[in-house]
């Protein structure tokens, strides 16, 4: 038994040493998979002057060219919220480029009409979500560091902007803050045909550092700036939530809970008015369902619900 305990202690020391070595490395620029901050240029930027009117919360929504219906549903629901509890809120969509000239032209027209699209010249694809997310961080870094908070989410999400704003005001933590649905002990998937496969060459360790589900996470604006600055010194991984988690680990920023009860639902949630009044984000939302649920919530603002 004593021999077994000794082996476990040695194994733990070796693992901690490996992790310390990994996160203390200054640069991974010799590896083929490294994010380049200076790569690409902005094709579309939204109509906002953060210096003159700093927002309290900016929501960055990853989307694709074909998801126009989802963007329109968001614009008619939680994305139309611009003033919540006296705080300015703005929602923008993150896109890459398409091989289709028609789609690119349509997106340009959409951007001119709504002035809410952020776009750079990289191919819009699922496995470029890390590039898309880092584009959002870069935009905050260059154009809107004055915002207090940022939320990164997806186009198939319900977001309760009002409740999120309420919780952020109560939390009142405006530096080194990162929250969402926390995954503290996830491990890399090594099966090659799995959608989330990560090779040992990309990431040789058996566990990821704590990160938040990419369906929706919220952070203070200084974190966006710090993540952007440190991003070139972290191995590039196509799983954007894991990549951001690696950046957080490098920065020694640990994700924390926003509320004592669960408020982020990456696995979805059955709709009810009272339940959705007290959540922040819910996944697997079809455009028509989002419109229906939002109208139900709007119609029931005076409804008495049990305290949460």
Swiss-Prot record:
Q: Where in the cell is it found?
A: Golgi apparatus membrane
Entry keywords, A to Z = Glycoprotein, Glycosyltransferase, Golgi apparatus, Lipid metabolism, Membrane, Signal-anchor, Transferase, Transmembrane, Transmembrane helix
Pathway the protein acts in = Protein modification; protein glycosylation
Q: Does the keyword Coiled coil apply?
A: no
Q: Which reaction does it catalyse?
A: a globoside Gb4Cer (d18:1(4E)) + UDP-alpha-D-galactose = a globoside GalGb4Cer (d18:1(4E)) + UDP + H(+)
Q: Which residues are glycosylated?
A: 128, 172, 229
Q: Does the keyword Metal-binding apply?
A: no
GO cellular component terms attached to this protein's record? Golgi membrane
Q: What is its main location?
A: Golgi
A molecular function (GO) held by this record is:
hexosyltransferase activity
**Broadest EC class assigned to this enzyme:** transferase
Q: Name one Pfam family in it.
A: Galactosyl_T
Q: Which residues lie on this side of the membrane: Lumenal?
A: 26-308
TM stretches of this protein: 8-25
EC numbers, comma separated:
2.4.1.-
Q: How does it sit in the membrane?
A: Single-pass type II membrane protein
Give the Cytoplasmic compartment stretches of this protein.
Answer: 1-7
Tissue specificity field = Expressed in brain and kidney.
The organism's superkingdom is given as Eukaryota
Q: Which SUPFAM superfamilies match?
A: Nucleotide-diphospho-sugar transferases (SSF53448)
Q: Name one GO biological process term.
A: lipid metabolic process
Q: Which family does it belong to?
A: Belongs to the glycosyltransferase 31 family.
Q: What does this protein do?
A: Catalyzes the transfer of Gal to GlcNAc-based acceptors with a preference for the core3 O-linked glycan GlcNAc(beta1,3)GalNAc structure. Can use glycolipid LC3Cer as an efficient acceptor. Also catalyzes the transfer of Gal to the terminal GalNAc unit of the globoside GB4, thereby synthesizing the glycolipid GB5, also known as the stage-specific embryonic antigen-3 (SSEA-3).
The name this protein carries in UniProt is Beta-1,3-galactosyltransferase 5
Gene transcribed to yield this protein: B3galt5
